């Protein structure tokens, strides 16, 4: 099998359109973990997230001829995934989420390698607060921006929204998350019996209010 690791997503997608299963397998390897974590924020059970991820890739393969490289492959893939989750909600409703798999953070400021574990756990805890605090679409905007690093234009494509509305949602989501984190800090400061859940809270609040130093 030829080495496909140096190909871009878009180059691989073009090979898929010519019938290359090897190219599609490479795309699955690149995106399956992050897509699963995205779907874990939406599906009622881990098994449902796994099923949705599988259906997303099946749909992507079946519709690969419709993909246009003007948009990134990730944007196109997340559009399919989000549409499938909407159908899932209509059938089953939304109950408790499956647990987010703690993966290496995308945007983390590390001081020493020893900080990695605690900061990764903190990173997952921050996203749990976001999930509990924000409405579905607001959470999606925040996730796609900071976890998936999609552009405003790409997020707008996934959500079928204007770029202006995405910017407004992002601003409001950051502000609301900042207030939630501040409240968490206030509650913990009143108790001496529990360890502080967010040791880097000041950086996180700075992010949520518009700063750039955050672990999401």
Regions from the PLM with identified roles:
Residues 2-3, 17-26, 36-55, 163, ...:
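Short, charged helix-capping/linker segments at alpha-helix termini
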Residues 2-4, 15, 129-132, 157-158, ...:
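C-terminal edge and immediately downstream basic/flexible tail or linker adjoining helix-turn-helix-like DNA-binding
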Residues 6, 88-110, 117, 186-190:
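Short, basic/polar amphipathic helix motif occurring as a linker/hinge flanking DNA-binding modules
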Residues 17-18, 44-45, 55-72, 91-92:
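Sigma70-family region 2
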Residues 18-21, 93, 110-144, 148-158:
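Amphipathic alpha-helical segment used for protein-protein interaction
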Residues 51-58, 71-83:
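Structural recognition of an alpha-helix C-terminal capping motif at a helix-to-coil junction
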Residues 65-69, 79-99, 119:
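Arg/Lys-rich amphipathic alpha helix in sigma70-family domain 2
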Residues 82, 86, 147, 152-187:
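DNA-recognition helix of helix-turn-helix
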């Amino acid at each position: 099998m030829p080495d496909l690791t140096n190909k871009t997503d878009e180059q691989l997608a073009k090979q898929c359109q010519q019938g290359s299963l090897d190219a599609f397998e490479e795309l699955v390897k690149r995106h399956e973990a992050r897509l699963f974590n995205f779907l874990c924020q939406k599906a009622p059970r881990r098994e449902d997230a796994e099923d949705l991820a599988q259906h997303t890739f099946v749909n992507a393969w079946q519709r690969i001829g419709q993909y246009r490289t003007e948009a990134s492959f990730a944007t196109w893939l997340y559009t399919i995934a989000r549409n499938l989750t909407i159908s899932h909600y209509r059938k089953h409703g939304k109950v408790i989420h499956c647990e987010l798999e703690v993966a290496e953070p995308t945007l983390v400021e590390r001081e020493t390698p020893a900080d990695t574990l605690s900061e990764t756990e903190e990173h997952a805890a921050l996203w749990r607060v976001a999930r509990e605090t924000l409405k579905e679409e607001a959470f999606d905007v925040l996730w796609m921006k900071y976890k998936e690093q999609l552009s405003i234009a790409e997020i707008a494509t996934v959500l079928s929204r204007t770029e202006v509305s995405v910017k407004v949602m992002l601003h409001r989501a950051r502000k609301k998350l900042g207030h939630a984190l501040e409240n968490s800090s206030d509650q913990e400061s009143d108790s001496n019996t529990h360890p502080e859940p967010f040791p880097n809270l000041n950086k996180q609040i700075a992010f949520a209010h518009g700063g750039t130093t955050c672990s999401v």
